[in-house]
C-alpha cells in the first residue's frame, strides 16, 4: 500500500497487523515522546494537561489498532477519523504547553510537525481505503479449490466410506 512518497510514508511490505503500518509506528513514536516531555518537572506539575495530552496521544495509536482489527474498511476509516481528531487534540494541548512555557518553541514546532505528518498519513490511508475495491477481511472469500483438489477429496471420502462398511 502506498501512502505517499515522502517522509517514509511508503508502505513497502505486506501489512499483516496494525504494528506493520508506518502511521502506527509514527503514532507510537509520538506517544513515547509525549510521555518523555510530560515527565519534565515544569510540565509534570500540570496533572490535568499531562493526563489529557497523554490520553490523546494514546488514542491515536489505539484507534489505528482497533480500527484495523474491525475487519471492514468502513469501520477502519471511522476509527482513522477518530485518530485524526486525537492528533489535532494533541496539537491543541501542545499549544497550551508552549503558552504555559512547559516546552520551548523548537520542541513545540517539532511536535506540531510530527502531528501534521501523522494526520496527513491518516488522511492518505483513509483516501486509499475509500478507493479500494477490497472491503476488508470480513469480506475475504476463502481460497477456491481446483477441480482436481475437489475430485481428490470426493474420491477420498468414497474410499473412506467403503473401508468403513
Predicted segments, located by residue:
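Amphipathic alpha-helical assembly/interaction segments
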Residues: 1-165
Amino acid at each position: 500500500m502506498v501512502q505517499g512518497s515522502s517522509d517514509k510514508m511508503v508502505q513497502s511490505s505486506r501489512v499483516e497487523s496494525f504494528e506493520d503500518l508506518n502511521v502506527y509506528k509514527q503514532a507510537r513514536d509520538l506517544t513515547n515522546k509525549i510521555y518523555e516531555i510530560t515527565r519534565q518537572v515544569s510540565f509534570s506539575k500540570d496533572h490535568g494537561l499531562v493526563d489529557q495530552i497523554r490520553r490523546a496521544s494514546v488514542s491515536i495509536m489505539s484507534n489505528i489498532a482497533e480500527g484495523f482489527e474491525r475487519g471492514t474498511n468502513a469501520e477502519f476509516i471511522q476509527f482513522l477519523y477518530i485518530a485524526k481528531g486525537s492528533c489535532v487534540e494533541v496539537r491543541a494541548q501542545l499549544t497550551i504547553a508552549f503558552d504555559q512555557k512547559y516546552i520551548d518553541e523548537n520542541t513545540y514546532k517539532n511536535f506540531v510537525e510530527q502531528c501534521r505528518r501523522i494526520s496527513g498519513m491518516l488522511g492518505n490511508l483513509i483516501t486509499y481505503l475509500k478507493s479500494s475495491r477490497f472491503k476488508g477481511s470480513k469480506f475475504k472469500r476463502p481460497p477456491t479449490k481446483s477441480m482436481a483438489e475437489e475430485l481428490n477429496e470426493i474420491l477420498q471420502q468414497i474410499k473412506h466410506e467403503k473401508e468403513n462398511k
